[in-house]
């Protein structure tokens, strides 16, 4: 699938779904139908849920957070961690009693978990009250799938093993007004040995630049101030397109859009990080000085077993280049503890990277066996007690450095995009710096949606408190 012409879903197929949306809108008129979506996992799943929500709003449904009043409940699932899967099973099971009380309730389960045959088999066997099951590759067909499930006795299942083309023009009900997610690519070609994503999201496919710019421009025209570009590995953007282009070119093009104040992106694979990209981040005024660069392990032996295709030394040289070129950059990362075969020496190498790179924050994970991945069959699986002990030490080191970095912001003036009321104090506002630091401060609600200067007066491990500087 190297050419764009091979991966586009035809306008006729999209129109068919639009026609079904209109039919369901007429059918639902005056019925006050409500839906609820629970999303697990990454920002790509969140964006998929925004698409499902947009379709449902166009069908005449309105959103609710109350299961008791919902006519349709959707779980959009994640299979990266076992814990997320267990939560899904628990929540689906808990709906059985509600289904008995309300036989007209439609329960749908979708997302990455459904791309695994053993999961679908488990749902068919143990959760027969589920009405609709679909995966990641046919999400654009949701209107048709919902319609067919309404006409079907029992469970309706449609999961495609192969990825579809890139779909343009689907409606989306954005979770945030000021911030918007934009998928720039789908799938992954890296096949890290611990990761199930290439098997659930398919191989890498990039969207055309013109389509991405059109979506970003539409968001800007509707009041969006900040966009986050999404991909499993944004650094390899453009490789499947017919005309040569890379992620650095895309950033420079998006930087020219009027109305967009900030550009963020995730996730980046270290092996594909070019100096051209570092230059683009440094030179584009709207691209935020924040970089999420997962390293997963500091041990070259473990990195090789993970199929990460870089070494500890490679990674640290990239960090140095980023900090030299963008001195005020905020760095975040992903770290896995307890990968099969990890020794105490290997773990010390991980702590070494944390100490040298000095991350603003880190997403830390205990290694979780994922059926269907090479790592699941590896020898020397690590004892859970050892994992937990190492995880605790890692967390202590990460939090210690995070607190030190945050303390360096005391009395500094930072630019904050005001997002809304603080989650910890409803009398305050909250927003984020360009480095993605969470800042709480007092201010009038008229500031929401604006860029303001805030002086930091208190520093905490995970957030900052400040005072607005009046112009």
Swiss-Prot record:
Which domain of life does this protein belong to?
Bacteria
Kind of enzyme, top EC level? transferase
Q: Which CDD domains match?
A: Radical_SAM
Show where the Radical SAM core domain sits.
174-404
Which free-text remark accompanies the cofactor?
Binds 2 [4Fe-4S] clusters. One cluster is coordinated with 3 cysteines and an exchangeable S-adenosyl-L-methionine.
Q: Which InterPro entries match?
A: Elp3/MiaA/NifB-like_rSAM, Methylthiotransferase, Methylthiotransferase_CS, Methylthiotransferase_N, Methylthiotransferase_N_sf, MiaB_methiolase, rSAM, rSAM_horseshoe
Subcellular localization is given as:
Cytoplasm
Q: Which cofactor does it need?
A: [4Fe-4S] cluster
Q: Does the keyword Iron-sulfur apply?
A: yes
**Gene3D superfamilies attached to this UniProt entry:** Methylthiotransferase, N-terminal domain, tm_1862 like domain
Q: Which residues bind [4Fe-4S] cluster 1?
A: 42, 78, 112
What UniProt keywords are attached to this protein's entry? 4Fe-4S, Cytoplasm, Iron, Iron-sulfur, Metal-binding, S-adenosyl-L-methionine, Transferase, tRNA processing
| Catalytic reaction annotation | N(6)-dimethylallyladenosine(37) in tRNA + (sulfur carrier)-SH + AH2 + 2 S-adenosyl-L-methionine = 2-methylsulfanyl-N(6)-dimethylallyladenosine(37) in tRNA + (sulfur carrier)-H + 5'-deoxyadenosine + L-methionine + A + S-adenosyl-L-homocysteine + 2 H(+)
Q: Where does the TRAM domain lie?
A: 407-470
| Main localization, broad class | cytoplasm
One Gene Ontology term, aspect cellular component: cytosol
Record's keyword annotation contains Ribonucleoprotein: no
MTTase N-terminal domain sequence ranges: 33-151
What family does the Swiss-Prot or TrEMBL record give for this protein?
A: Belongs to the methylthiotransferase family. MiaB subfamily.
* HAMAP family attached to this UniProt entry: tRNA_metthiotr_MiaB
Record's subunit section: Monomer.
According to its UniProt entry, the function of this protein is described as: Catalyzes the methylthiolation of N6-(dimethylallyl)adenosine (i(6)A), leading to the formation of 2-methylthio-N6-(dimethylallyl)adenosine (ms(2)i(6)A) at position 37 in tRNAs that read codons beginning with uridine.
What protein name does the entry list?
A: tRNA-2-methylthio-N(6)-dimethylallyladenosine synthase
What organism is this sequence from?
Answer: Alkaliphilus oremlandii (strain OhILAs)
Quote the gene name from the UniProt entry. Answer: miaB
């Amino acid at each position: 699938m190297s050419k764009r012409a091979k991966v586009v879903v035809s306008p006729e197929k999209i129109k068919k779904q639009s026609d079904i949306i209109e039919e369901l809108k007429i059918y639902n008129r005056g019925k006050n139908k409500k839906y609820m979506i629970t999303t697990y996992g990454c920002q790509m799943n969140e964006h998929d849920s925004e698409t499902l929500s947009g379709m449902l709003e166009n069908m005449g449904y309105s959103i609710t957070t109350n299961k008791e009043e919902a006519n349709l409940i959707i779980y959009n699932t994640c299979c990266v961690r076992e814990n997320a899967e267990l939560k899904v099973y628990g929540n689906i099971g808990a709906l059985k009693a509600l289904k008995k009380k309300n036989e007209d309730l439609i329960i749908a389960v979708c997302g990455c978990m459904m791309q695994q045959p053993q999961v679908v088999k488990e749902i068919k066997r143990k959760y027969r009250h589920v009405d609709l099951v679909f995966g990641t590759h046919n999400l654009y067909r949701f209107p048709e799938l919902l319609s067919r499930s309404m006409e079907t006795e029992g469970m309706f299942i449609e999961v495609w093993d192969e990825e579809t083309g890139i779909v343009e023009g689907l409606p989306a009900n954005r979770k945030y007004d000021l911030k918007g997610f934009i998928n720039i690519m789908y799938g992954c070609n890296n096949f890290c040995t611990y990761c199930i994503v290439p098997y659930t999201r398919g191989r890498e496919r990039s969207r055309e630049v013109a389509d991405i710019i059109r979506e970003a421009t539409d968001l800007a025209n509707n009041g969006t101030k900040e966009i986050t570009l999404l991909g499993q590995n944004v650094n390899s953007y453009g490789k499947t397109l017919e005309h040569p282009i890379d992620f650095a070119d895309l950033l420079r093009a998006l930087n020219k859009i009027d109305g967009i104040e900030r550009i963020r992106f995730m996730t980046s694979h270290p092996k594909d990080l070019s100096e051209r990209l570092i230059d683009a981040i440094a030179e584009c005024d709207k691209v935020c000085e924040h970089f999420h660069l997962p390293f997963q392990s500091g041990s070259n032996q473990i990195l090789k077993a993970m199929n990460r295709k870089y070494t500890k030394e490679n990674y640290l040289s990239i960090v140095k280049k980023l900090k030299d070129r963008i001195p005020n950059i905020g760095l975040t990362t992903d770290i896995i503890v307890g990968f099969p075969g990890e020794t105490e020496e290997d773990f010390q190498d991980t702590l070494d990277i944390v100490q040298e790179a000095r991350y603003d924050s880190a997403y830390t994970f205990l290694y979780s066996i994922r059926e269907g991945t090479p790592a699941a069959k590896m020898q020397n699986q690590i004892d859970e007690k050892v994992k937990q002990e190492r995880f605790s030490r890692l967390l202590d080191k990460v939090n210690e450095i995070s607190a030190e970095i945050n303390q360096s912001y005391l009395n500094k003036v930072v630019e904050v995009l005001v997002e809304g009321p603080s989650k910890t104090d409803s009398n305050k506002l909250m927003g984020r710096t360009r480095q993605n630091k969470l800042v709480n401060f007092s201010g009038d609600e008229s500031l929401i949606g604006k860029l303001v200067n805030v002086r930091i007066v208190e520093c905490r491990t995970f957030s900052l408190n400040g005072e607005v500087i009046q112009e």
